[in-house]
Amino acid sequence: MFNEYFGGGMNGIVFQELRESRGLAYSAFADYSTTKRKEKQTNYAYTYIISQNDKMMDCIRVFNNILDTMPQSQAAFELAQQAAVKRIASQRITKANIIFSYLGNKRIGINYDLRRDIYAAMPKLTLEDIVKFEHDNMANKSWLYIILGDENNLDMKSLEKIAPVKRVATEEIFTF
């Protein structure tokens, strides 16, 4: 539900703020995920923002602001809630995904389809729950940035103010 509201699709807060409201990005997406391990629960968030080089620092500034003070919209929340419920209701686990789903659930100590619990909890969630989750898990945290682009066209001085910059050759990224 959080991903649907925050970063998923064209109605997500990240897309709306960076693309629709401000016109800073061609595309923007964010996701919060957990690993399926009972013994060691690891949570992580990732995003991608595709923009012009000259808008990069504006995108970083706006995205950090979204993370620290997430915009709240009851209308967007209701759309996200409806979309999440419909997605679970229409989603089917088939073919090889049957075993992968079973093994994933087994790793976290359950022997049934976890989506059943999520589906039942969905109507009870409120916008305040989403805001609290975001505040507790994402606001005011340190982030790792990966910037792809021609260094000659990027504002490297501004990037260096955010964090130390590590330059990586194309061959280190694409090893084939």
Spell out what each predicted region is.
Residues 22, 65-72, 160-171:
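A common structural junction motif
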Residues 2-4, 15-69, 75-127, 135, ...:
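M16 family metallopeptidases and their MPP-like homologs
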Residues 15, 127-176:
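Proteolytic maturation boundary segments
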Residues 8:
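Structured mid-domain segments that build the active-site/substrate or prosthetic-cofactor binding neighborhood
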